[in-house]
């Protein structure tokens, strides 16, 4: 049985008999599900599950980076911090009656809404405005929402931040403190506990599970690392499987569905602490030397300055977790270099 590129451990619906409202709803939704599945098929095949080396290299930059590496001409950056300036024209400033917020788009967005309710309460307290969580499961959809003003406050995954800054006017402000007084995580390669794969060099001839093409630790960083350190290219020296997310990659390793996966260490720890995987279920065969910045929270560049300040006050006062202010120009320098390396893929 082949592994589904989106769900490595598919679980069939439980068998049932007799009439039930759920069965009726299920039956009426079949045509819709088919349409969505077909659309999803064409989306997935636009980024091949096991891309041939030549086609992969030719299309890599456009698929992953495209025009996302430079600040859009719609914005200005007078102070050179690489982030869109707040408009000087008062008519271009917004002061919404209700603040719309969303954490990193993921399959567990509903659970994230519950997790971040205390933060929303804090923001409501400091701004005096009601705060509503927007459920989003797709990164590109989250980018679109932010660009269209359907989100005012958000956290984007580390690899998506440059696109959010350059295309949508996202202003990163802070990242959660993960250990002691530090923020961030490492990219790790993990394998099933009984795997014969012991080093990154052993990935040659194997299949690497990656999360999605916008992910830094789940896609861009591992591919550039294997290329630069071992001259290994996907589609030529090893194959790829798109899992759809870090949690899916980790579950695939736990069930022996994947040979090796690239994931973020903080998400691995979080899932392990929640009982989703045990330490004895996997082994880490490589951990990146550099500490990657954790997914940052930020706000829209065109919010009124006084509203921006009140939002910052909420993050500064919040303690579970604590947040640490970040510098996009400094802290995302390495991420931007990886993006540049992807753009110059064929030159290596």
Regions found by a protein language model. Give the residues of each.
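Bilobed "Venus flytrap"/periplasmic-binding protein-like clamshell domains
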Residues: 101-124, 159, 179-251, 260, ...
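Extracytoplasmic
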Residues: 96-98, 118, 126-128, 141, ...
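Periplasmic-binding protein-like
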Residues: 104-105, 179-188, 276-312, 325-345
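N-terminal hydrophobic or amphipathic helices and topogenic motifs
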Residues: 2-141, 323-348
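A ligand-binding cleft/hinge motif common to bilobed small-molecule-binding domains
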Residues: 155-168, 225-228, 252-255, 259-280
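Conserved functional loop/turn residues at catalytic and ligand-binding sites
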Residues: 150, 207, 257
């Amino acid at each position: 049985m082949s592994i589904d590129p989106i769900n490595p451990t598919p679980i069939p619906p439980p068998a049932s008999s007799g009439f039930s409202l759920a069965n009726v709803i299920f039956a009426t939704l079949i045509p819709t599900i088919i349409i969505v599945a077909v659309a999803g098929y064409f989306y997935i095949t636009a980024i091949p599950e096991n891309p041939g080396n030549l086609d992969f290299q030719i299309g890599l930059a456009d698929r992953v980076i495209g025009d996302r590496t430079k600040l859009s001409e719609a914005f200005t950056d007078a102070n050179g911090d690489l982030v869109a300036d707040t408009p000087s024209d008062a008519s271009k400033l917004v002061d919404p009656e209700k603040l719309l917020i969303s954490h990193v788009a993921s399959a567990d967005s509903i659970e994230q809404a519950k997790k971040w309710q205390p933060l929303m309460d804090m923001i409501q307290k400091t701004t005096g405005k009601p705060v509503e969580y927007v459920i989003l499961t797709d990164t590109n959809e989250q980018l679109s929402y932010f660009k269209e003003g359907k989100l005012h406050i958000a956290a984007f995954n580390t690899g998506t931040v440059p696109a959010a800054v350059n295309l949508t006017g996202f202003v990163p402000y802070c990242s959660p403190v993960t250990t002691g007084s530090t923020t961030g995580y490492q990219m790790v390669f993990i394998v099933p506990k009984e795997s014969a794969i012991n080093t990154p060099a052993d990935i040659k001839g194997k299949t690497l599970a990656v999360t999605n093409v916008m992910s830094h630790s789940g896609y861009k960083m591992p591919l550039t690392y294997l290329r630069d350190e071992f001259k290994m290219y996907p589609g030529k020296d090893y194959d790829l499987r798109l899992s759809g997310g870090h949690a899916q990659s980790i579950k695939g390793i736990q069930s022996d569905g994947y040979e090796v996966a690239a994931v973020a260490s903080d998400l691995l720890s979080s899932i392990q602490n929640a009982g989703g995987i045990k330490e004895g279920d996997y082994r880490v065969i490589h951990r990146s030397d550099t500490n990657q910045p954790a997914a940052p929270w930020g706000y829209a560049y065109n919010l009124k300055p006084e509203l921006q300040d009140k939002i910052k006050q909420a993050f500064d006062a919040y303690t579970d977790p604590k947040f640490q202010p970040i510098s996009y120009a400094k802290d995302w320098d390495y991420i931007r270099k990886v993006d540049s390396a992807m753009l110059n893929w064929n030159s290596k």
